[in-house]
């Protein structure tokens, strides 16, 4: 990392790193519940937010604005990941054995 990066560059780096984390996830047995995955993603967002909070600089208002933008981006990426995971879980559900009514 460069000795001095703008907050915009820091946010961009953090988002790229978070995307790498999400892309590395392998959905495999044993599967975890959707509720547990929500907790995991929430924890990841908090981890990245707390780490990057120490790196932003400038006036407090500028720092707050940068962190708000960063957290919103991470939450959006996390929501997209959870939607993909939800779809994956549904694809693993056994087919329903109900017969169509005649």
Swiss-Prot record:
InterPro entries: A_Hb_stabilising_prot (IPR015317), AHSP_sf (IPR036468). Expressed in spleen, bone marrow, and blood, with highest levels in bone marrow. Its main location: cytoplasm. It comes from the Eukaryota. It holds the Pfam family AHSP. GO terms for molecular function: hemoglobin binding. One of its GO terms (cellular component) is cytoplasm. GO terms for biological process: erythrocyte differentiation; protein folding; protein stabilization. The keyword Transcription does not apply. Gene3D superfamilies: AHSP. Monomer. Forms a heterodimer with free alpha-hemoglobin. Does not bind beta-hemoglobin nor alpha(2)beta(2) hemoglobin A. Acts as a chaperone to prevent the harmful aggregation of alpha-hemoglobin during normal erythroid cell development. Specifically protects free alpha-hemoglobin from precipitation. Belongs to the AHSP family. This is Alpha-hemoglobin-stabilizing protein. It comes from Mus musculus (Mouse).
């Amino acid at each position: 990392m460069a000795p001095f990066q703008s907050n915009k560059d820091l946010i961009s780096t953090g988002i790229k790193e978070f995307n790498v984390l999400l892309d590395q996830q392998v959905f495999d047995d044993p599967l975890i519940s959707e509720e547990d995955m929500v907790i995991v993603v929430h924890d990841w967002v908090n981890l990245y937010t707390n780490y990057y909070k120490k790196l932003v600089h400038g006036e407090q208002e500028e720092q707050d604005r940068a962190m708000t933008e960063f957290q919103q981006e991470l939450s959006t990426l996390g929501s997209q990941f959870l939607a993909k995971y939800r779809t994956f879980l549904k694809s693993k559900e056994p087919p329903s054995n109900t017969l169509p009514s005649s």
